[in-house]
Amino acid sequence: ISKIFSTGMSLGGFMSYRLACELNEINSVGSVTGSMSGYYQCNPPKKTSTIHFHGTADGVVPYDGVEWSLSARDAHAFWKTHNVCNSQTEINLPDFNGDGRITKRLISYDCEEEKSVELYSLEGEGHIWWNRSWGHDINTSELIWQFFKNQ
């Protein structure tokens, strides 16, 4: 096995981040509506690429964070700092379904060991797994797989 990836939704996303915080074998993490614990001090043993998807109206794991969970942007900032990423850009993705909601893609790149850190912020969206065939603007599964393949 040359590369190990971990992905999960909600608590599975928390688990994936925790694995990257503790295990040297994890190459990349994908988190959907999960974040990092506000109670746990993460000290990753190596650089790790991350991709994170979060709805801004998530009522289960709030986008802006709570005592027990970092905000989506704080989780992104943690991995950007850990991976020593020198550049960042944010773009709005096309509104394929025409609902007027914006998906923002925040990309941190030019990181050490060719790692990258991405955050998809889905305006007005809740605690779900996104799929274009269900009428959403993005397909989470495809984006995670493409991200992992490039790591």
Name each model feature, range by range.
Residues 136-151:
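Catalytic active-site module of serine/aspartate enzymes centered on a nucleophile-bearing elbow/loop
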Residues 25-35, 49:
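A conserved short beta-strand
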Residues 52-54, 58:
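Short beta-strand/loop motif that positions the catalytic acidic residue
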Residues 1-11, 94:
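Gly/Ser-rich "nucleophile elbow"/oxyanion-hole loop immediately N-terminal to the catalytic nucleophile
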Residues 68-100:
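Acidic, glycine-rich loop-and-strand cores that form catalytic or ligand-binding grooves
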Residues 13-24:
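Short glycine-enriched nucleophile-adjacent loop
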Residues 126-133:
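Catalytic histidine-centered segment of alpha/beta-hydrolase-like enzymes
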Residues 59-71:
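Conserved alpha/beta-hydrolase "acid-adjacent" motif
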